[in-house]
From Swiss-Prot:
GO MF term (any one): hormone activity
Family: Belongs to the somatotropin/prolactin family.
Gene coding for it: GH
Main location: secreted
A Pfam family recorded for this sequence: Hormone_1
GO terms classed as biological process: animal organ development; growth hormone receptor signaling pathway; positive regulation of growth; positive regulation of receptor signaling pathway via JAK-STAT; response to nutrient levels
Protein name per UniProt: Somatotropin
Source species taxonomy: Eukaryota, Metazoa, Chordata, Craniata, Vertebrata
Any Gene Ontology CC annotation: extracellular space
This protein's record includes keyword Metal-binding: yes
Length: 190
């Protein structure tokens, strides 16, 4: 990220987060359609959604909760969420070798890295250059399972995709909220 106005840094980070979230949501739907029987789908009201590792992070869970946090806190939560996916996402291309949706899966890792760099650039700007090194959360999510003939592996991947989608939605929401707070745009729909 070259030196640029803070508003541009936020705009770029929001766009990257939106793009990744849409890609995650599309992939989740494609995976569900292709591999998960109707009665086992999370979208069914009676089924239990996957437990996401990110639920153990003390990140805000709703918009009201997020509005109580400082921009720096929201950036830290966003960074932790993004970093928790850097390792597992590298296995996505093996899981979705023949998927049209994930034809760009090799680029998901790069897109996540770009978003990570964007968040770190925002943190440096807001901390006036006193940015501490990134803290990579351990443990992160497990790797995706490349065995798609095994029902347990399918359900594990399905759960991971669900968490990936949820976490990217959180990051997108936090970034939009900060951008709206700082620049008071009239079209601030979160």
């Amino acid at each position: 990220f070259p030196a640029m106005p803070l508003s541009n840094l936020f705009a770029n980070a929001v766009l990257r987060a939106q793009h990744l979230y849409l890609l995650a949501a599309e992939t989740y739907k494609e995976f569900e359609r292709s591999y998960i029987p109707e009665e086992q789908r999370h979208s069914n009201k009676n089924s239990q959604s996957a437990f996401c590792y990110s639920e153990t992070i003390p990140a805000p869970t709703g918009k009201d909760d997020a509005q109580q946090k400082s921009d720096m806190e929201l950036l830290r939560f966003s960074l932790v969420l993004v970093q928790s996916w850097l390792n597992p996402v590298q296995f996505l291309s093996r899981v979705f070798t023949n998927s049209l949706v994930f034809g760009t899966s090799d680029r998901v890792f790069e897109k996540l890295r770009d978003l990570e760099e964007g968040i770190q650039a925002l943190m440096r700007e807001l901390e006036d250059g006193s940015h501490r090194g990134p803290q990579i959360l351990k443990p992160t999510y497990e790797k995706f399972d490349i065995n798609l003939r095994n029902e347990d592996a399918l359900l594990k991947n399905y759960g991971l995709l669900s968490c990936f989608k949820k976490d990217l939605h959180k990051v997108e929401t936090y970034l939009k909220l900060m951008k709206c707070r700082r620049f008071g745009e009239s079209n601030c729909s979160i």
